[in-house]
């Protein structure tokens, strides 16, 4: 059994899997800087099947440091969630949220304290208000599909409006008296002439 093992981008995916197979549980540290999806998948699964978690069980708590880049390219939802769960808050964790599902966005929300920045995020009414707020808090130029959003969801959007792309509120925005003056101002400031804005 290997102990005090540290993995880095110099090891390829096959080497990472082989080393993790003989490492002790919870004993391995990872510097994720420069790692590509195949290496990160090996960190999660070792030589096991995809989503097996055979590798991530060997990683120490907060054991992933360095620059960790997460996206759907080459990684499953289970793999992304597992990697985020073992990332140190001191790591630089960046997420490309392009085309992420509701479940994947929920995972980002659950691990938001470990994430430094999120790009290409799109949130909709399928996300809860708390999820919308946390995801947008780390986002850059996010897109919001505001159609049918509740007052609480729109409050979460308004509170993070600076992280929403200009004109990024989708096609339909409905405002009611449940929104404060400041929230209405923030939302209208990001709406464009392409938005169908209803005030009821």
Q: Predicted segments — roles?
A:
Residues 1-200:
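Solvent-exposed, low-complexity segments and loops of surface/extracellular structural proteins
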